[in-house]
Amino acid sequence: MVSNNMKKVFIDSRSKELTNEEKEKENKNSPNIITSSDYELGFYRNEIDTRRSYITKLLQTKVWTPNMKPKKHNCIIIFDWDDTLLPTSFLTRGGCFYEEMELSSSDEKKILELQDLVLELLNNTIEKGTVYIITNAGMDWVKYSSQRFYPKIIPILEKIKIVSARGEYEKEFPGNSRQWKIEAFLMLQNTVNLKLVTNIICLGDSLFEMEAGRILASRFTEAFIKTIKFREAPKLDELIKQLKLVNKQFNSIYSSIKNLTIRVERKKK
């Protein structure tokens, strides 16, 4: 039983990183890098883009042009919570958060900066489409942790659908956190018109989110899938830099007319 001074949370299970062979394969296909400070966004080309003919048709018939602002309902944006928006690994030890934990004044300032960066990102994304937070944590963790660390974002969270993949699918798939995420993502196809949604953007620190995003995209008649993988278990400074970089480049990612596989990486020295 959890004591009153300790909050039990469930952090997303981590999938293993890409193998060296997979990394080398993707690095050969990397067309460009966008940098900021000591982090960069690595863009990786998909070997097969099944949407090319569709894009060409839209351009030729002038049904859609690169400068045309997509309709709001044509975009789904899915966030992970732990270690993507909230520095959960920093705030917890062994999956447990202690309510009486004390932060240094320096760390408190960094949490406040993170709060502003998360607020900026959520405000931007909610203007562009339907936003979801899908987490493998327990049902109340997003609400509790935002009240504790990010109170400024609470009003905007009320406009966002928050889903606990664990809460929805743990009984059906016990111990299989990968499948929880996939099923929670697929649940979204029941809430939208599969023929209208053309832009799916997935942001998370685990390969689970990236895989689930691609599986969801495959259910749509036509969709562009953009995945943005954050670094796992970031320190406060690291998450600040990652969010700054994504905030800076999000509009370009959103308006891109192709599938994108993006990883936030340290600059190579």
What is the role of each PLM region?
Residues Y54-P70, I111-N124, K143-S146, E183-M187:
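Eukaryotic beta-rich interaction modules
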